């Protein structure tokens, strides 16, 4: 089943020719079982998006070569791939306990091999407290395993049972 999501790139400034500074808004939702409702899963804003792009240039991502040949050009596809894996991981977590783990590992691989270059931020622990590094770190760190239990409990045992067993859903 397709995951309903949106990526909105808001270009804030042109740093130099074909180099842009932007904010990325990411949203994702999942269906609530037995209803026509959608439940919001992700609503995040990433202010650290700097990338190089020339009109009509294809966005290509290679998981084996995250940095590509040019860090500026590789950054935007790496950011999109990172958030795609995070969304898929959270979606799987909402249907199966710790079901998203393989996708979180893929997102972590992108962080560990992220493009590095002039003006590129958001991939390192010292780039702030609300960035791509800390998001995947908090989801993959064993100390925070309760996050997966809560996510699964809220969506699968809670919202998905509101139609057929409201008492059980509210106790979850």
Task: Write out the residue ranges for each language-model feature.
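Start-of-domain marker
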Residues: 1-21
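Generic surface-pattern signal
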Residues: 89, 93, 113-116, 131-135, ...
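A cross-kingdom marker for long, charged
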Residues: 137-172
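Acidic/His-rich structured neighborhood in mature extracellular/periplasmic domains
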Residues: 16, 21-129
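Short, Φ-rich (hydrophobic/aromatic) sequence segments
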Residues: 79, 83, 87, 133, ...
